[in-house]
Amino acid sequence: MRFSANIAIIVNIIFLFIVVEFVLPTFIRSGDVRFRRYYRNNGRVSRAATAKKERIWPEGIIPFVIASNFSGEHQHLFLRAMRHWENFTCVSFVPRQPHHKHYITFTVDKCGCCSYVGRRGEGPQAISIGKNCDKFGIVVHELGHVVGFWHEHTRPDRDMYVDIFYKSIQTGQDYNFEKSKPEEVDSLGEPYDFSSIMHYARDTFSRGAFYDTILPKPNSGFRLEIGQRVQLSEGDIRQTKKLYKCAECGGTLMQESGNLAIQHAGVCTWHIISPQGHTIFLNITGSTLSPPSSLCGKEEDNVITVRDGVSISSPVLDRICGGDSLFRTIASSGNRMLIQVRSSTPAASLPFATYYAICGGPIYANEGVIHSPKYPESYPPNSDCQWTIHVDENSQVAIEFVYFHLEQHKECIYDRLILTEGISKNSKKDGKEMSETFCGLIEKKTIVSKTNQISLRFFSDNSVQKTGFELRFTKELNECATDKNICHHYCVNTVGGFKCACRVGYSLSSNGFSCDSTCGGYLKASNGSISSPNFPEMYPNSKTCIWEIEAPDGYHIFLNFTKFNVEGMKTECAYDYVKIGDSEKLCGEYHEALLFTTPRNRVRIEFSSDSSVERDGFFANFIADFDECQNDNAGCEHTCQNRLGSYVCTCNPGYILAEDKHNCKEGSCFFEVNAPAGDINSPNYPNDYPKGQNCSWHFVTTPGHRLMLTFSSFQVEEHAQCKYDAVSVYDGGDGSAQLAGVFCGLAPPPLLLSSSNELYLTFSSDASVSRRGFQAHYTSLCGGRLTAESTPGHIYSHATFSDSKYGKNQDCSWIVRAKSPGRGVRIQFSTFNIESEEGCQYDYIEIYDGPEATLERLVGRFCGDTSPEVITSTGPELLLIMHTDNAEEEKGFVAEYREAPRSSSTKRTFVSKTRHSPLEEPIHDRNE
């Protein structure tokens, strides 16, 4: 079904800074639970009005800048949204150049999702894409404000089409539903558009879940969901074309190739857009113009004008008058071409030109951007593109990977990008050019060439295609080799500048170039100790200490941290940290000793503190120890492990150490597995497993979580009933639990998921044939069905609780059922720390009085650091749901549950940073 449309638009043109508030409903399935997820942002800046015509962007050209704090994923998203507008209308989004005085800047402002309406006309203007705004449809919506559109429901005649429910609107947000004055907006003769991407959703600014703030009138005939954030509606497209007076003949062309045909007399305009780093070739193939006109030279009649860019002020590549020889090929210098045809007489609708975009070629510039074919969409199969970048002499080429996603392979044999350096006396290696190959997903990377020239070649095969890449290149100078280098110790060249560094035992002073004697140092000794500055007192802020410890050749260094308390969450060391060699950063507080053995006779230890919180710090002893394992494995049959002052032999899984403490023999094969995730394998894997073997693994993860087992390799002697060798998996803590399956042969078992926090696996082999065995990965998943008994059980928000914060984009559900008939479930929280937000729209806990997530069963939604009150179900079951978004994380929660007498009623509350009174019944329930 197709709907007519309209958007409230600037007339006389209105200037407004507008904040978009909406709810984007998405159904999420978690186990057997079905519920809605909401995204909201709060606040709106008061709007200002003007009657100046300058608020329309001249020629529909909108220059843009993207703030550097956005990731490559964000920049790819913004470009997709801009291309969406360009594809269906005649507006153009172009990277800002120095001559552009007025332009938009993608940024993050306190308003969340917000933008000015139309062109502000005072230099740069912000389009804020804040938290939870980074969705394709939301960015398209925000760009609608930039183009010149108000929210659809603010048009003066909206009361004929929608009802506003003010009692459901959040306090202080009523003004978001105010009607515009008739002199402020113009519908351009178009009817109301429920399908517009500029329309509010039914529960935008609602004061609670399932509250409606705006709905189509019952007699409107519209039954679909309003507030879509998927794509421009047909009404959006029509109104944009009216607002910017788009030519009826022509259009925007983004395909790799196509035809141009004059459909009628008058003006036809085509914008051809290709990815950056591509060249557009236009072939004029036929004559469709009338005889020469005296007005042709003025581009007023019977003329084809081809311009090298997007604007009528762009350089003219060619101008062809009627009667001229039309057959010719015209090439652009960039990735855009504008073709305009003016004719005085009707012409047959036949193609008069073809075009195609070619990737690659030489680039002589000191800065620029290169895109993969069809970017920001997926690149085509069988691509082969080569670019050669030349910058000024005596310079280097710096290439930044803004966005990069090609088909993954460990050797990049499918799709790949190859960077090859120009040969110079410094870049030769065995007489060959220096090259490097890339594929897969690369989040951030910068490469600097040795010379002023570098070649890039992109290949794709005929199978899997990804979204490609955006690369930015700039001319780079080695400032460390110039008189700009004022560093006291070391100068480290960076793209666009340099930074200073200090020798071991010194730290960089606040001026950024001098070095002060401080903590750290070079220690060549067999034993000693190191500690954080001021230990055992608090270490200072903004301090960096580096120690380099060296022992004699053939020795290892043992480190024993007897005290360790450094700001951080252990696995998330974003603030202060200790880094040992190339290992991960250490932080947090440890009450037990931390022991480390270095793989070589040298180790580098770095301590760094930020500008805020201090802790006690650390104290560590070190001692050099001779590595007996380096000589003939110290006589160990399987594995030799060096120990302080000695060594110890260990055996592979399924074997035990013999009496001589060096050789290995088959023995007990039972394993207790308590880590939340890891890998297991059959005895002697990847070699054949021994005959007559019986092994078992008992997996136990964090309470309130389940275990998922995935086999990555599987070769067990085959038999129809698995009578010889077999892997058996039980859904519980031992072999008496429910059997999940018995497996053998070459086909890996399916993904196995436990119903509780325990799983039991056995492996047995007979006395005959043996195979390679198996390798499996296990991980912990939140949620599941739990049984409440008289003794308490526990639910943890995440499997690594206390070691790290909960994860992003989590949707977990727990159904707790009382074991005894006639009993209910009582739940209380001993720890509660969920991202705080007034409406609990980002991260939250929901509790339902029953097994289903329905409005009438909702007890409340909770967030912040205030624990909910004790909750007891009125029936045998209770449902707990946890949702997290893609931004901030906190410590999480620990909930205790047990069976209890059923409650006669359950108070419905809504908790965020502070506790609110019980919710009123909704004015309009949702129809699910």
From Swiss-Prot:
GO annotation (BP), single: protein processing
Recorded GO MF terms: calcium ion binding; metalloendopeptidase activity; metallopeptidase activity; zinc ion binding
Domain CUB residue range list: 249-359, 360-476, 519-625, 669-781, 782-900
Catalytic residues (positions): 142
Cofactor remark from the record: Binds 1 zinc ion per subunit.
UniProt superkingdom: Eukaryota
Annotated S-S bridges: 90-246, 111-133, 113-114, 249-268, 359-385, 412-439, 480-491, 487-500, 502-515, 519-545, 573-587, 629-640, 636-649, 651-664, 669-695, 722-744, 782-812, 840-863
Basic and acidic residues composition bias: residue spans: 917-928
Xref: Gene3D superfamilies: Collagenase (Catalytic Domain), Laminin, Spermadhesin, CUB domain
Sequence ranges of Polar residues compositional bias: 902-912
InterPro entries membership: BMP_1/tolloid-like, CUB_dom, EGF-like_Ca-bd_dom, EGF-like_dom, EGF-type_Asp/Asn_hydroxyl_site, EGF_Ca-bd_CS, MetalloPept_cat_dom_sf, NOTCH1_EGF-like
Carbohydrate-modified residues: 69, 87, 283, 527, 560, 694
A GO CC annotation given for this chain: extracellular space
Localization (cell): Secreted
SUPFAM superfamilies xref list: EGF/Laminin, Metalloproteases ('zincins'), catalytic domain, Spermadhesin, CUB domain
UniProt EC number: 3.4.24.-
UniProt-annotated stretches for the region Disordered: 895-928
Signal peptide (UniProt feature, chain positions): 1-30
Domain EGF-like: 477-516, 626-665
Peptidase M12A domain: residues covered: 48-247
Repeat keyword on record: yes
Top-tier EC class: hydrolase
Primary role: Metalloprotease.
Name of the featured protein: Zinc metalloproteinase nas-39
Gene: nas-39
